[in-house]
Design a protein with these regions (language model features):
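N-terminal, positively charged nucleic-acid-binding surface of large information/translation enzymes
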Residues: 1-158
Length: 158
């Protein structure tokens, strides 16, 4: 005796698409915020991922746990402001760009040009942004992905 109807991948994809479209069309995230006009605030900054690499399972598990906290606080009546961030600098980024360019150290960077190298690093951190964004939406994380904080942005640094 089958307790649950088995669904094909196509059926799951169609259902997922309908739900995501409904959430988007009805602007569910903003409704969760606007419906709590005088409620106490709970502000959540999603610890930044570096989008120069592919998202891993650890990213998705962390996003799920963070989203669970935000949704729980929403159910408790808080006005939950959520903002995603991007880690756009640091040694891992520089090492990856050095590897891509075939460099073996500081002298190669100086020969290439520090300004040019920094620009290459800035470009590299956005390689997989769309993959991260797509996965964030598909997993149903309610978070502001349109206005992220970016760690190389002067507004963030100040």
């Amino acid at each position: 005796m089958e307790k649950f109807k088995s669904l094909s991948k196509d059926a799951v994809d169609v259902t997922e698409g309908r739900i995501l479209e409904k959430w988007k069309n009805e602007d569910i995230l903003n409704k969760c915020i606007e419906n709590r006009e005088n409620a106490p605030y709970f502000v959540f900054y999603d610890g930044p991922a570096t989008a120069n690499g592919h998202p891993g399972l650890h990213h998705m598990v962390a996003k799920f746990l963070k989203d669970t906290i935000c949704k729980y606080k929403t159910m408790q009546g808080y006005k939950v402001l959520r903002k995603v961030g991007w880690d756009t600098h640091g040694l891992p980024v520089e090492l990856q760009v050095e590897k891509e360019l075939g460099f073996s150290g500081k002298k190669d960077i100086e020969k290439y040009g520090i300004k040019e190298f920094n620009q290459k690093c800035r470009e590299s951190v956005w390689k997989n942004e769309s993959t991260f964004t797509d996965l964030t939406e598909k997993m149903g994380q309610f978070i502001d992905i349109k206005h992220p904080y970016v760690t190389y942005d002067n507004n963030y640094i100040e």
